[in-house]
Design a protein with these regions (language model features):
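Terminal amphipathic alpha-helical/low-complexity segments used for targeting or macromolecular assembly
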Residues: 1-148, 153-155, 160, 166, ...
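Residues at structural and domain junctions
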Residues: 11-14, 18, 110-111, 149, ...
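Short glycine-/acidic-enriched loop or helix-start segments at secondary-structure transitions
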Residues: 66-68, 191, 207, 317
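Glycine-rich hexapeptide-repeat left-handed beta-helix
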Residues: 32, 197-349
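Acidic, glycine-rich loop-and-beta core segments that form the ion-binding/anion-interacting portion
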Residues: 151-231
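Generic signal for short, ordered secondary-structure residues
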Residues: 11-12, 103, 107, 140-142, ...
Length: 349
C-alpha cells in the first residue's frame, strides 16, 4: 500500500536568495504546491508520524523536484529503510519512515545543493537557467542561443516569439507571439506581437504591435503605441508615444504625451526639468518637430503643429500652427574686395 508523503520545509539563512526572478524558497513552494507541506524553523519541530513518509528539505535547495522525492520514497520502501539521506548526510535533506528500518543510507543527486556558497550559487543558477530555457523551447519559443540568453522564471513568452542572443529578460515581462528581441535588457515590460527590440534597455515599458525599438534606445516608464519607430540613441521616459509616432535618432522625450503620427526630429530635447520640478509636455497628433528643437516644459503643441529646426519653444503652439524661434542667418563677405584669398590661415611657403 502506498504511504502518503509529508513535506517539511526547514528555514535557512539562504532561502531568500534571489535566482532568476524568484527566491530559493519560492521555487520549492511552487514545486511541491500539490503536497501536504509545512514550514518549520528547525528540524526539531518536525512531527514524524507512523504510516507515512516524512520528507525534510531545507528551503535553500531550489533545484529539488517532485521526481527527486518520489524516487527517494520508492527507494526507502523497496529497501525497507528507516532514514534515507538525500544528497548526502551533510545536505540536511532526508526521508524518514517512523516505523524503523535500516539507517545510514544516502542517495546522491545534483539537485540537493544548497545556495550557501558562491560556487553552489553558480551551479544552481545555471541549472535553473537551463530548466527555464528548456521549458521555453518546449513551448515553441525560439531561443537561438541559450548559452548567451538569460530569462527570469517570472517571464512569460508566447510560442512563436524570437529571443536572439545576448538578451537578459527579467521581472514581470510578457513577450507576445511574433515579437523579436535581440541583445537587449528588458525588465517588467510588455512587448506586443510583431514588435522588434534590438540592442536596447527597456524598463516598465509597453511596446505596441509592429513597433521597432533600437539599436541603443532606452525606454523607462514608457508606453509606445502601434507601428512606432524609436531609433538609435533615443530615450523615452515616463511618456506616451502615440500610434505611428517616430523618433529615428538622438532625442530625449521625457514626461511627455506625444500624439500619433508625430515626427520627432534628430537632436530634439523635451526640457522637462527646471532645476527643482519636473513638468510635462503635450504634443498633438501629426505634428512635425524639426531637428535640434528644444521644447521647454510646461508647453503644448496642437494637432498638426510644425516646429522649425533649431527652435526653442517656450510658448504653446496652436493647432496647425508654425513655430520658429532661432537667430536670423546673416551672410557676410569673408575678405575685403581685392585681398588675396587665404583659407589656410598661415604663411605661404
Amino acid at each position: 500500500m502506498d504511504m502518503p508523503l509529508k513535506i517539511w520545509f526547514v528555514e535557512s539563512g539562504h532561502s531568500e536568495r534571489k535566482l532568476l526572478g524568484r527566491s530559493a524558497e519560492e521555487y520549492l513552494l511552487r514545486e511541491f504546491s500539490a503536497f501536504d507541506t509545512e514550514k518549520v524553523v528547525s528540524e526539531g519541530e518536525c512531527r514524524f508520524e507512523e504510516g507515512r513518509l516524512d520528507v525534510v528539505i531545507p528551503l535553500d535547495m531550489p533545484l529539488v523536484t517532485v521526481g527527486d522525492v518520489e524516487r527517494g520514497a520508492e527507494y526507502v520502501k523497496k529497501h525497507s529503510l528507516g532514514v534515507l539521506a538525500l544528497g548526502g548526510a551533510a545536505s540536511g535533506a532526508k526521508i524518514v519512515r517512523s516505523e524503523g528500518g535500516r539507517s545510514g543510507y544516502f542517495i546522491s543527486s545534483p539537485h540537493f545543493v544548497k545556495v550557501d556558497s558562491a560556487k553552489n550559487v553558480r551551479l544552481v543558477y545555471n541549472q535553473l537557467k537551463e530548466r527555464i530555457t528548456d521549458r521555453l523551447l518546449e513551448a515553441g519559443v525560439f531561443v537561438f542561443d541559450p548559452a548567451n540568453t538569460v530569462v527570469d522564471d517570472t517571464v512569460r513568452i508566447a510560442a512563436g516569439a524570437e529571443i536572439l542572443p545576448f538578451c537578459k529578460i527579467e521581472g514581470d515581462t510578457v513577450i507576445e507571439a511574433g515579437a523579436s528581441v535581440e541583445g537587449s535588457h528588458i525588465s517588467d515590460c510588455r512587448i506586443e506581437g510583431g514588435a522588434k527590440v534590438v540592442m536596447s534597455h527597456l524598463a516598465d515599458t509597453r511596446v505596441g504591435a509592429g513597433s521597432t525599438v533600437g539599436p541603443f534606445a532606452r525606454l523607462r516608464g514608457a508606453v509606445v503605441g502601434k507601428g512606432c519607430r524609436v531609433g538609435d540613441f533615443v530615450e523615452i521616459k515616463n511618456s506616451v508615444f502615440g500610434d505611428g509616432a517616430k523618433s529615428a535618432h538622438l532625442a530625449y522625450i521625457g514626461d511627455a504625451d506625444v500624439g500619433g503620427g508625430t515626427n520627432v526630429g534628430c537632436g530634439t530635447v523635451f526640457c522637462n526639468y527646471d532645476g527643482k520640478w519636473k513638468h510635462r509636455t503635450s504634443v498633438g497628433r501629426d505634428c512635425f518637430i524639426g531637428a535640434n528643437v528644444n521644447l521647454v516644459a510646461p508647453v503644448s503643441l496642437g494637432d498638426g503643429a510644425f516646429v522649425a529646426a533649431g527652435t526653442t519653444v517656450t510658448q504653446d503652439v496652436e493647432k496647425d500652427g508654425f513655430a520658429i524661434g532661432r537667430s536670423r542667418q546673416v551672410n557676410k563677405t569673408r575678405r575685403a574686395e581685392g585681398a588675396e584669398k587665404d583659407f589656410g590661415g598661415g604663411d605661404k611657403a
